[in-house]
Regions:
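Short, low-complexity N-terminal intrinsically disordered segments enriched in polar/charged residues
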Residues: 1-37
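A solvent-exposed, acidic/Ser-Thr-rich amphipathic alpha-helical stretch
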Residues: 25-92
């Protein structure tokens, strides 16, 4: 694995952790910044674009006093130029 790939994996991992911070703080601007404009979010029960996901979060998350997302088993693969695939397990 070359240095460029390692740096890309680190940057993608940072995005995953910023996403968790944004969700837990209800900072939807931070959450939005974690997505490419044409990204698809697939949470299993939810699959859609970032605007649809954030709208769902705005309605759903305030039900709880607080959330704390633990991100693990971060697998980043299929890095090819400007595209990559990542799969992450989350416990909230």
């Amino acid at each position: 694995m070359d240095l460029e790939t390692l740096l890309a994996k680190q940057e993608i991992g940072d995005v995953i952790y910023r996403y968790a911070r944004g969700i837990d703080r209800l900072d939807f601007d931070l959450v939005r910044s974690c997505y490419h404009p044409d990204a698809v979010d697939d949470h299993g029960a939810f699959k859609g674009n970032v605007d649809e996901f954030i709208e769902m979060c705005r309605e759903f998350l305030p039900r709880w006093t607080a959330t704390m997302h633990f991100m693990g088993n971060v697998l980043i693969d299929e890095i090819d130029g400007t595209a990559a695939r990542a799969e992450t397990y989350a416990v909230a």
